[in-house]
UniProtKB/Swiss-Prot annotation:
Its EC number is 2.3.1.286. It comes from Oceanobacillus iheyensis (strain DSM 14371 / CIP 107618 / JCM 11309 / KCTC 3954 / HTE831). Binds 1 zinc ion per subunit. NCBIfam families: PRK00481.1-1 (NF001752), PRK00481.1-3 (NF001753). GO terms for molecular function: histone deacetylase activity, NAD-dependent; NAD+ binding; zinc ion binding. It is an enzyme of class 2 (transferase). The active site is at H114. GO terms for cellular component: cytoplasm. This is NAD-dependent protein deacetylase. SUPFAM superfamilies: DHS-like NAD/FAD-binding domain (SSF52467). It is found in: Cytoplasm.
Length: 236
């Protein structure tokens, strides 16, 4: 049935959350408080306040996150989505993830709602750098400013352009597929609802129930995302 929806859709949007990344082995953000960080709340470290007032702790935390992302990579689900994009079956990927795995697998049209750990920029002048600077223990810009990941921290404004594009894509969607998101973070969790209100079929693939399951045309909770996407590819 979903294969038919995919082939019949003129505009398909994929929306991915933490569950997409954890299938690659990457711990989710909320699980980041292990080891050295066990006594810390990640949401407090990942804040503009910590960057401004406790920069060493901030850099230590994010260097570890950058190194962790570089240990892992895309799984079969990422590659299937990239292939579907090439085939014209997927028209937009909207992601809450910051690991860059969609782009690494070959997807071109990716809207990152919360930024990316693959890039850094200077907090003072805005100059962009690769995250390899953190790996090589380089934490300052040529101007002397602090290098920080190009992600949205707690206490910062959300990226208006990425969100507006995501809202526009949701309005156009015939098929909207949620992969691995609990749909509890606002305003990102409004995006699937916009698609549904504009006539899209809504599919939610997530291990745990979400607040929007009641609006979905289909929910899947007993399959891993990669297996689910592979099963669709193998249909027919």
């Amino acid at each position: 049935m979903i294969k038919d929806w995919l082939q019949e859709s003129n505009y398909t949007v994929i929306f991915t959350g933490a569950g997409m990344s954890t299938e690659s082995g990457l711990p989710d953000f909320r699980s980041a408080n292990t080891g050295l960080w066990k006594q810390h709340d990640p949401s407090k470290i990942a804040s503009i306040d910590t960057l401004n007032n406790n920069v060493e702790t901030f850099i230590d935390f994010y260097r570890e996150r950058v190194l962790k992302v570089k240990e892992y990579g895309p799984h079969q689900g990422h590659y299937i989505l990239a292939e579907w994009e090439k085939q014209g079956l997927v028209h937009s990927i909207v992601t809450q993830n910051v690991d860059g795995f969609h782009q690494a697998s070959g997807s071109k049209i990716v809207h990152e709602l919360h930024g990316t750990l693959q890039k850094l920029h200077c907090q003072s002048c805005g100059k962009e750098y690769s995250s390899k600077e953190y790996v090589e223990n380089e934490y300052h810009c040529d101007c002397g400013g602090v290098l920080r990941p190009s992600i949205i921290l707690f206490g910062e404004m959300l990226p208006q352009e990425a969100f507006q594009t995501a809202f526009n894509d949701a309005e156009k969607a015939d098929l909207f597929v949620v992969l691995g998101s609990s749909l509890t973070v606002s305003p990102a969790n409004q995006i699937p609802l916009i698609a549904k209100e504009n006539g899209a079929k809504l599919v939610i693939v997530n291990q745990d129930p979400t607040p929007y399951d009641q609006y979905a045309d289909m929910t899947i909770s007993d399959q891993k995302i990669g297996e689910f996407l592979r099963s669709i590819s193998n249909e027919g």
